[in-house]
Amino acid sequence: MTSLARLKFYATQPHACSYLPDEQATTLFLDPSQPMDVQVYAELSEMGFRRSGDHLYRPHCQRCSACIPARIPVNAPELSRQQKRILKRNADLQVRGVRPAFSEELYALYANYIEKRHADGDMYPPSREQFNTFLVRDLPFSRFYEFRLDGRLLAVAVTDVLPNGLSAVYTFYDPDEERRSLGRYAILWQMGEAARLGLKAVYLGYWIKNCRKMNYKTEYRPIELLVNQRWVTLS
């Protein structure tokens, strides 16, 4: 175990919340001068921290505790009929993990995804600079898992491989392949990959009960939420 007591953290000023209208958010960041050590990252992930670009962060709001860290234990998944159908529907895809690097093919998929799925969000409009800063970080534990059909790129799951699990950083995919449910499939695939690697969980980021865009996270069972500094199974 690493001593976390020596680490420094910084809180932002209140800013508009990306998920809940009319709410102000505060974010706690690990001191960016601290090297991105995989063991520190793993221990902080147990405390609800996430990675964005070169930064580790978690919500630190004074008046709101709606953002609840969520993870899926992978040793005994309880797949629904819909999830089994999604796995079967995508059995023809080939997956490979590569080190993060920019390519026009990747950016075109990302830009199309943002434009068609998140035109109302703070990541719109997409740009190459945004894509590189957010996702293309050459970190030894980070992978781009590419999902292809006969060579055609359909989805990318940006994933950090930690000692305690896989952290699902971001997934983008072809929005025209709606029937495949590629976002949900990427999580199911990550669950299988975590189990194959002998890891205990897939870390999904934050679940917000009153945010419709977050509802999909509780489709995966069992799922654990970090409540009062303890991981508890959602019943």
UniProtKB/Swiss-Prot annotation:
One of its GO terms (cellular component) is cytoplasm. One of its GO terms (molecular function) is leucyl-tRNA--protein transferase activity. SUPFAM superfamilies: Acyl-CoA N-acyltransferases (Nat) (SSF55729). The keyword Acyltransferase applies. The keyword Cell wall biogenesis/degradation does not apply. Keywords: Acyltransferase, Cytoplasm, Transferase. It catalyses: N-terminal L-glutamyl-[protein] + L-leucyl-tRNA(Leu) = N-terminal L-leucyl-L-glutamyl-[protein] + tRNA(Leu) + H(+); N-terminal L-aspartyl-[protein] + L-leucyl-tRNA(Leu) = N-terminal L-leucyl-L-aspartyl-[protein] + tRNA(Leu) + H(+). It comes from the Bacteria. It is found in: Cytoplasm. One of its GO terms (biological process) is ubiquitin-dependent protein catabolic process via the N-end rule pathway. It is an enzyme of class 2 (transferase). Its EC number is 2.3.2.29. Belongs to the R-transferase family. Bpt subfamily. Functions in the N-end rule pathway of protein degradation where it conjugates Leu from its aminoacyl-tRNA to the N-termini of proteins containing an N-terminal aspartate or glutamate. NCBIfam families: PRK01305.1-1, PRK01305.1-3, PRK01305.2-3. This is Aspartate/glutamate leucyltransferase. The gene is bpt.
